[in-house]
Amino acid sequence: MLKSYRAVLVSLSLLLVFVLSGCSNATPIDAHSTGIWDHYFVYPISFMIQFVAHHIPGASFGIAIIIMTLVIRSAMIPLAVSQYRSQAKMKKMQPELQKLKQKYGDVSKDLEKQKQYQKEMSELMKSGGWNPLAGCWPLLIQMPIFSALYYAISRTEEIRTSTFLWVNLGHADPYHILPIIAALTTFIQMKVFQSNSTSGEQVQMLKMQQIMMPAMILFMGFAAPSGLVLYWITGNLFTMMQTIVLRKIMEREELQLQKA
């Protein structure tokens, strides 16, 4: 269930790029921009990127986007911990959920049976301390950041016209190298995050997501500004390392509890 929420939110984030690319506001963004969205969301992102690029020796706007991504993701670590704990609780509950599913069988044709099944499943999740929305908060928070970053890049002349490596940050990668890297890191990141899922039904669903999500990233990356694709890549790499570290910490905590 958690994976379904994540898949929907990731899909919405990617769809956001497609929609934004067709309705981008060309008005330059600066400290005098008005409106809640421009002044409190887009401009702060633009300011952060410009500040890093201008004040850190050797930094470019590409490096500034990478640093800004790392800062944002680091600030979201507490939410990631909550997300991982939620995933661990869901894994522990799988045997009980499977028993419940076997008890009721196919409930699609019996409304009363379906209601009872949903009620018992909700009670089981509540007793296990699992909240399906806990794992979605990092994605929910990233969506406005994602949108603000798009506008910060496209509406800040200095960022939009700057280059990093072989790409112009305000335009799509002409060689499609960054979108391919973004798709590959998305695939690997999903494999790492989902490697402790055990149920057969989940495995089939996750295999489908592991194909669909990177494919969507690749498709959107062909049209997205290179600065935004750079944000995806950096975020994926950070999430991979974060998941590996958190998994080790959680496993150590579980071993200590078993020994106590």
Swiss-Prot record:
A lipid is attached at C23 (S-diacylglycerol cysteine). The keyword Glycosyltransferase does not apply. Residues 1-22 form the signal peptide. A lipid is attached at C23 (N-palmitoyl cysteine). Its main location: membrane. CDD domains: 5TM_YidC_Alb3 (cd20070). It is a multi-pass membrane protein. GO terms for biological process: protein insertion into membrane; protein transport. The chain crosses the membrane at residues 29-49, 52-72, 133-153, 164-184, 213-233. The keyword Membrane applies. Pfam families: 60KD_IMP (PF02096). GO terms for molecular function: membrane insertase activity. GO terms for cellular component: plasma membrane. Coiled coil: none annotated. InterPro entries: YidC/ALB3/OXA1/COX18 (IPR001708), YidC/Oxa/ALB_C (IPR028055), YidC/YidC1/YidC2_Firmicutes (IPR023060), YidC_ALB_C (IPR047196). It is found in: Cell membrane. Keywords: Cell membrane, Chaperone, Lipoprotein, Membrane, Palmitate, Protein transport, Signal, Transmembrane, Transmembrane helix, Transport. It comes from the Bacteria. Required for the insertion and/or proper folding and/or complex formation of integral membrane proteins into the membrane. Involved in integration of membrane proteins that insert both dependently and independently of the Sec translocase complex, as well as at least some lipoproteins. Belongs to the OXA1/ALB3/YidC family. Type 2 subfamily. PANTHER family: CYTOCHROME C OXIDASE ASSEMBLY PROTEIN COX18, MITOCHONDRIAL (PTHR12428:SF65), OXA1 (PTHR12428). This is Membrane protein insertase YidC 1. It comes from Bacillus anthracis.
